[in-house]
């Protein structure tokens, strides 16, 4: 007789995702291949999880959770079904070893990407095809994402209201984001702020719609490479440019 095929993997319950991440990574902190944990249920090891029911993959609620601060984690979670996820806030923040291909994730329901790859210095994967049409916050999304330099110029930013510190200290980032729709953005403070050693960003963003922006504080502080014509920007609502 042929061996009995393994049972289909059961979907992770939405309310259990954070607890299951903690339990699995306690056993297999780098890969998430928590075979002992998985032997006691029918969810499988982390790379094989069915996450189709999960809505909240955030890394911070009232405290660190999920992958937040999991500094050695570098598991292959690129096959996850994220089509129900609305919250990726701080999801991979301080996951300092993480550099896996997550470019195929379905992000069409995600509203919050605040700090998603904040302090993820190893990450440099192609994520340009993510559907960001519902995202309202990209603040501090790539802070200290020191290696990140991928084309995200086609992202839909029509609903984004905050880009505060989005690329702060992401000193290798230099991609064309000039066609982004920034018409709802109110906060661009610290957006391209660099360390004392400077940054690489020098792209034409002169056509950005800045009519709703109120805060541009330190927007280009230590952005040493930047030298583009932004003289046409509408700064009528800006109250802070220091």
Which residues does each predicted region cover?
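Negatively charged
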Residues: 4-242
